[in-house]
UniProtKB/Swiss-Prot annotation:
Important for catalytic activity (site feature) positions: H221
Residue spans crossing the bilayer: none
PROSITE patterns registered for this protein in UniProt: A_DEAMINASE
Gene Ontology CC: one annotated term: cytosol
Name of the gene encoding the protein in the UniProt record: add
Annotated binding of Zn(2+), by residue: H12, H14, H197, D278
Gene3D superfamilies: Metal-dependent hydrolases
SUPFAM superfamilies attached to this UniProt entry: Metallo-dependent hydrolases (SSF51556)
Binding site residues for pentostatin: H14, L15, D16, S141, G170, E200, H221, D278
Principal EC category: hydrolase
Functional description taken from the UniProt entry: Catalyzes the hydrolytic deamination of adenosine and 2-deoxyadenosine.
Record protein name field: Adenosine deaminase
Amino acid sequence: MIDITLPLTDIHRHLDGNIRAQTILDLGRQFNIALPAQTLETLIPHVQVTSTEPDLVSFLTKLDWGVKVLASLDACRRVAFENIEDAARNGLHYVELRFSPGYMAMAHQLPIAGVVEAVIDGVRDGCNTFGVEARLIGIMSRTFGEAACLQELDALLAHRENITALDLAGDELGFPGSLFLSHFNRARDAGWHITVHAGEAAGPESIWQAIRELGAERIGHGVKAVEDRALMDFLAQQRIGIESCLTSNIQTSTVASLADHPLKTFLEHGVLASLNTDDPAVQGVDIIHEYHVAAPAAGLSREQIRQAQINGLEIAFLSDSEKRALREKVAEA
């Protein structure tokens, strides 16, 4: 179902949600950190979703073991590098990796700005090694509150030339976007793009707020947009993209089943929706699974899957010339 004549992208992919189980095991041993299991086989149920979680917050607890072993900046650098290696193995030509430096720093009180620098270094080395093109999106973890998000923002702005966009993720219901208006004003002043997790746990009003108040150019997940036809019209007319993550939305119980997922409706409505993974290591999936298994199960036709692939590059945070160069590179391969 993947069109090999087109660039394959993943523009909603959490770097700190894609820490390999083997790496968790390795780092746990290296830093003498107690893990819930001592072999790869027995560790996987603790760090990977093996059945549907009751809600988003329950799903997010699966991520915690990955960051609990980040006891040094070198460990952060390693997982960033491995993220690019994984992208290359999946056949991705372009990936946007998003990460919350405060979340990665938290368990071992690492310097947040140091985490940002380590991630930048690891991704740069990975791109040079594996030939994948990547951009970084900084996340503010809303669950930690406004002050903690300000610390994350300051650390990201210290490396602003290496960061492409700002995102807001975490507990959407408990920490609405209205708490972070000044944060996003600073991000836009820095020339960054804006994407926001919205309409995943909260309703369409959260998406409207992300667009009108935070300046979102893309929406992460955005499944609740299907409940508001005027919103879908607006998204299509204004070319505001939706970063769809099919398997993730089932695993978090955001959507009951793939057959119920609104991605097909979005595409029929002319919304620029794309296919993405979200947290591949935690979910136990890759981008190939999303195209070959999840998308058909969600009712997408072959042409709709191709359109979602086209949309992935169309709404990527790249210039028109960069998109054109990527298309030409793939066409000539």
